Amino acid sequence: MIQTKDIIELTDTYGANNYHPLPIVISKAEGVWVEDPEGNRYMDLLSAYSAVNQGHRHPKIINALIDQANRVTLTSRAFHSDQLGPWYEKVAKLTNKEMVLPMNTGAEAVETAIKTARRWAYDVKKVEANRAEIIVCEDNFHGRTMGAVSMSSNEEYKRGFGPMLPGIVVIPYGDLEALKAAITPNTAAFILEPIQGEAGINIPPAGFLKEALEVCKKENVLFVADEIQTGLGRTGKVFACDWDGVTPDMYILGKALGGGVFPISCVAANRDILGVFEPGSHGSTFGGNPLACAVSIAALEVLEEEKLTERSLQLGEKLVGQLKEIDNPMITEVRGKGLFIGIELNEPARPYCEQLKAAGLLCKETHENVIRIAPPLVISEEDLEWAFQKIKAVLS
């Protein structure tokens, strides 16, 4: 059997150097556990950036995949499929929105949200042609496509890719007065993550989302929540916006929408917003394909049936409390909602992620000095306690 070092060598030889992974190869996975080619087992505390909320290879989701793969996998949108309509209904009811537009990856859904907001601004708000603006937040992460990196404040994400998309206005995260000052008659939308993930699990001030939504409604600006990473139970609520009792004008969903098995994403909004599209104005050959829809329906059913949102809230509160008790001045803050947790250090986090790997835990540094803890929501209390003891041993 091919070994870890051989696979990494092949990757380094032939793969574009656009990632810096920990030196581990995963060849098997189930639930919260993964295994390398040599048979070493590790607990997954990253969940593929929250795409695996339901756990690796959840039986119900895998069975849905196999059943659908044995019938039909792709029709394109030139024809109807028997899975798309039921999936539309499932997501519309989950988000309490009237319409859903399917894509494949989170970044594609972000691009779709940008296009939706711009067209809405021109067709409904009557902004002058080619003058629409979109407000975003510093340290955001909305993906790697041109629209998404144009919204980023990280210059390394932009280097060598210019010119950027015009009409982007960047404000500090969680700053209500900056939002008010940034809005002009040309503002189409305010796009934000309810909790910033890649920036280090940044949580806005309590009440900010609600106040920002009120400002947007007053100024006729769309409030768009990127819940790709925070949605579907990760933060202990179905959506992170729920922490402020906020229903955005538009949701952007992805990652766990496919149960860690098949990529599917979408935007969801009411008809007065998504109704700006007509046939031919936007699309995707694979978007809303029957295989993805069947998997997604099962993934959403697992979240509901196994009460994973409630588990995330309960287990997350306990783990955050435990982590805050670790006595080490190197730890400057522990923050999080549900099982979406950041441990901020006053030094680089990667060496500690490597030590955690040696102890049997897989997690990844984010924003240089933050260890992100985000296990699959199916994790047992016993396994989470085991993980905490390992983390405590490394960080104490």
UniProtKB/Swiss-Prot annotation:
Keyword Thylakoid among record annotations: no
UniProt-recorded Gene Ontology molecular function terms: identical protein binding; ornithine aminotransferase activity; pyridoxal phosphate binding
Principal EC category: transferase
Co-factor(s): pyridoxal 5'-phosphate
GO biological process: L-proline biosynthetic process
Family indicated by similarity: Belongs to the class-III pyridoxal-phosphate-dependent aminotransferase family. OAT subfamily.
Name of the protein: Ornithine aminotransferase
Lineage: Bacteria, Bacillati, Bacillota, Bacilli, Bacillales
